[in-house]
Amino acid sequence: MSDTARISGGSFTSPPGRDVELNSFKEASQTRLYPYSSRKEEEGREDEQQRPEREEDTGALTGYKLVLVTVGLCFCIFCTSLDNTIVATAVPRITQQFHSLDDVGWYASAYLLTTCAVTLPFGRLYTFFPIKWVYLSALFVFELGSFICGITPSSLGLILGRAVAGLGGGGLFSGSLLIITQCVPLRRRPAFSGFIMSIFAVASVIAPLMGGAFTDHISWRWCFYINLPFGLVSAVVIFFTFQTTKPVVQASLREKAAGLDPLGTATFLPAIVCLLLATQWGGAQYPWGDGRIIALFTLFGVLLACFVGLQLWARERATLPPRLLRGRNIWGSALYGFCLNGAMFTFVYYLPIWFQAVQGTSATESGIRNLPLVISNVIFAIISGVLVSATGYFGPFMLLSAAMASIAAGLLSMLHPSSGAGEWIGYQVLLGSSIGMGFQLPVFVVQTTLASTDIPTATALMTFIQLLGGAIFVSVAQNVFRNQLAADIRAALPMLDPKAVINAGPTSLRAMYSGETLTTLVAMYNDAVVHTFYLAIGLAAASFLAATVIQWRPSPKSISHPDSS
């Protein structure tokens, strides 16, 4: 046969050896773009997805540079986490100034919607472009949104600013964890990541307290101005201290564009927006049977089906390569984080309501009474990170965390109007310890069991899942709370308008009612809050079941590094 391809009957036959050449070229191209992933695409087993046992930590920092980067990342996480809940106590003053009561729901949801929607696509940006510049770009967008919120003269401007801030915030949480992977050797990574992630929980708890203090003593605009100096410090530290590294995946511009999965992103973003709008509006702003809610859920289902189909078709170039979800450690960790975060945010939102409505504290005092939850969370996040670093195991700590969270949720559901400090302090310490121990572990799993090329996408996935769990179940808890309180009022106090009582808020209860009516309403508030805690019990128990699928296998600890002893 000649060296020239022959055409016979409309068929093309390659010369000898050409098929081998073409196949080798295709394999080499895919390996260049996805050097770890392509070899394992059809396997999906955890033990085959584990990163090499020895991997150079060439970008690791030590001394004051490591301290500066850690502080800078903490500032970023603190600011983005504050924005989740800080606006809650400022809403009454904002609506009074802008005469915008109908826009109240958008002040919180605009930030949440864009944050959740862009978190997963940011994983691809971190894969194909230098982490430093993607991170600083996200920080700039977040700061721009905060600046718009601070100076806006209108309600529409505030909503726009919140949405812009969310676009940047969606890339900062996962980006902070990725910078840690670049700066800290693997054996020390859990301790650093645990401390940084504990800042998220701390900021989420104290944000309403800070928002109330700014609103009462300075201006509600400082709820957003506060982000500017913190963000500036973070930007300066990251710019001068964190060295620019090559992208995780080396590829041409065309390959990068394909790897960003524009079609998948175009279906994923509106799908998440539809889901979150439906869960936030349903039962609160509109009845669940309202055409708008049904349409949103329908659109979500259609868009999600399109997204899944596109991911299966795109495979390695997908926003979320299907291969990543085949390993039980990955999908088990995702389910664990989804449920545990949902339980945590249920308590973050409704424990202050219990203090204010049932025990008659002010918003500021309720924040102070949440300190046992905050302090225990931080302490056990650090302890958990150190123990995981020392033992190399994360499975046992995930089980212990979920078991403790289930017990703590059950104990908190036993609170009543006459509960003493010993009860609510002790129960919060147990809850904070359990959440602190397990909150960061899903990220540890992906960062210690996957190849380096998969870490940005998998880290973004875990961040997205945790944010989504909090967003969805806070909305579910809100509906449980409102429906239970309204039902109790209609049954025992038919002369009162349930909507008026709910809209008045927990801090106005004692100013509006007295005597037997107040006593009855306090008991009803207690009952409604406890029903949200029942939801948290179920979520904590579900996280325990998810933790049972995680393999008890030591993660790599011995990483070669010039600074290692």
UniProtKB/Swiss-Prot annotation:
Family affiliation: Belongs to the major facilitator superfamily. TCR/Tet family.
PROSITE patterns, sorted: MFS, SUGAR_TRANSPORT_2
Residue ranges crossing the lipid bilayer per the database entry: 59-79, 103-123, 128-148, 164-184, 194-214, 222-242, 257-277, 293-313, 335-355, 378-398, 399-419, 425-445, 457-477, 530-550
GO cellular component annotations of the record: plasma membrane
Ranges of compositional bias, category Polar residues: 1-14
Composition bias type Basic and acidic residues, residue spans: 38-54
UniProt signal peptide: none
Name of the molecule in the record: Efflux pump aunC
Keyword Cell membrane part of the UniProt annotation: yes
This protein's UniProt keywords: Cell membrane, Membrane, Transmembrane, Transmembrane helix, Transport
Membrane topology of this protein: Multi-pass membrane protein
Functional note: Efflux pump; part of the gene cluster that mediates the biosynthesis of aurasperone B, a dimeric gamma-naphthopyrone.
Any Pfam family matching the protein: MFS_1
Keyword Magnesium: no
S-S pairs: none
GO molecular function: transmembrane transporter activity
Subcellular location: Cell membrane
InterPro entries membership: MFS, MFS_dom, MFS_trans_sf, Sugar_transporter_CS
Sequence segments annotated as region (Disordered): 1-57
Main location: membrane
